[in-house]
Amino acid sequence: MTIDRTYPIFTVRWLAIHGLAVPTVSFLGSISAMQFIQR
């Protein structure tokens, strides 16, 4: 029972971290790409 309660919390936390990290990396990548294109 302990593993069943801990696993979903870890999964939600993992999804939340990646859900915030992926758009941030793509956003920074798009900004750097636009700066290189302007130059």
UniProtKB/Swiss-Prot annotation:
The chain crosses the membrane at residues 14-30. This is Cytochrome b559 subunit beta. It comes from Allium textile (Textile onion). Signal peptide: none annotated. It comes from the Eukaryota. Its main location: plastid. One of its GO terms (cellular component) is photosystem II reaction center. The keyword Iron-sulfur does not apply. Pfam families: Cytochrom_B559 (PF00283). With its partner (PsbE) binds heme. PSII binds additional chlorophylls, carotenoids and specific lipids.
